[in-house]
Amino acid sequence: MDAPRINKWLKPLSALYGVGVRLRNYLFDKNVLISNSFDIPIVCVGNITIGGTGKTPHVEYLIRLLHPRYRVAVVSRGYKRKTKGMIVATEGSTAWDIGDEPRQIKRKYPDLTVIVDADRSRAIGYLCDLAEEQRPQLIVLDDGFQHRKVKADLNIVLTDYNRILTKDYLLPAGRLREPAGSIQRADMVILTKCPDDLAPIDLRAAKRDLALYPHQKLFFSKFLYGQGLKPLFSDQSPSAEVRSALAIAGIASPKLFFREIRTRFPSGTDRIYPDHHEFTDREICLLIQDWHELHRKDANAIVVCTEKDAMRLALRQSSFPQEMQERFYYLPVEVKLMFDQEKVFVDRLLGVIQHKK
């Protein structure tokens, strides 16, 4: 666990921001501001920090657990999309239409209902009004912990093992959207990106630091990169002789991604961009230059990006030379609960669904 970096010069602004956040939460807690309830069970997957907890892989984990048995819909804001209003995603929807994360989910689960709308209540109302045979039996609210206009039946909050929540600071000095104590609104907390060698003393330290109530269940998850590389533009698999890679990441916390890439491909170049980054023409040109330089040294060199970046880079296919397209891959990531916690986790989810039947 690492202590977060805090910009001490911005602490006065964080104090002002905190006043506004606490007032808003107080008004919701006292029912001055109203949270809307719905007939369909809603599971919210959110966080208290600004990104970096692995939210989308955890949403996909819920889908894998429940979608075979229940009609599941995902409602998301559609961050950084270029459209407005409510959009029901189709297989042809792009990252510009619905955002990179909803596009990633829809691409993996084409028969899943995915809706993007800044007004999450409107999107959920639309789903509730569908005919019974189309109406979802469960709604996963993506990144909705601060969207208190919707009353979720189960709030799951994610927090990064590598960034101690209780030692972080409110925006803009730190990365907290709201005070760390707000985690007490959660029903379940998942400590994400845990190392494989997590020891009992680490578990006790995490429980102590988070100071959860007895009714709040704490889970531990880790990232898995076992699927292998997927081609982005072609159908060619990488050669077994590949030792070099140009690695591209525009996500909030790319450390685990780069560590995995360098474990597989020891040499190459790493390029880091902001989360949800929209690549400019100049940046694409620089990536092409990086590729040519690497390819001159190693004829088998490849390009690898994160799965989320692939949703945006796919829109720039024509900008890349053909030879680079044929060696362009992305690395999917999945999550797994540790310490045989999956049954307890699933039972809690099923309890929420059964309660509203």
Swiss-Prot record:
Name the pathway it acts in: Glycolipid biosynthesis; lipid IV(A) biosynthesis; lipid IV(A) from (3R)-3-hydroxytetradecanoyl-[acyl-carrier-protein] and UDP-N-acetyl-alpha-D-glucosamine: step 6/6
Instruction: State a single Pfam family of this protein.
Output: LpxK
Query: Quick check: keyword Thylakoid in the entry?
Result: no
Instruction: Specify whether Lipid biosynthesis is a keyword of the entry.
Output: yes
UniProt binding sites for ATP: T49, I50, G51, G52, T53, G54, K55, T56
Highest taxon in the source lineage? Bacteria
At the top of the EC hierarchy, this enzyme's class is transferase
Instruction: Spell out the InterPro entries in the cross-references.
Output: LpxK, P-loop_NTPase
Note the coiled coil stretches, chain numbering: none
Q: Which reaction does it catalyse?
A: a lipid A disaccharide + ATP = a lipid IVA + ADP + H(+)
Enumerate the GO terms in the molecular function aspect. ATP binding; tetraacyldisaccharide 4'-kinase activity
The stretch of residues making up the signal peptide is: none
- Keyword terms, alphabetized: ATP-binding, Kinase, Lipid A biosynthesis, Lipid biosynthesis, Lipid metabolism, Nucleotide-binding, Transferase
Q: Name one GO cellular component term.
A: plasma membrane
Identify its protein family. Belongs to the LpxK family.
Query: What's this chain's function?
Result: Transfers the gamma-phosphate of ATP to the 4'-position of a tetraacyldisaccharide 1-phosphate intermediate (termed DS-1-P) to form tetraacyldisaccharide 1,4'-bis-phosphate (lipid IVA).
* PANTHER family linked to this entry: TETRAACYLDISACCHARIDE 4'-KINASE (PTHR42724), TETRAACYLDISACCHARIDE 4'-KINASE, MITOCHONDRIAL-RELATED (PTHR42724:SF1)
Spell out the protein name for this chain: Tetraacyldisaccharide 4'-kinase
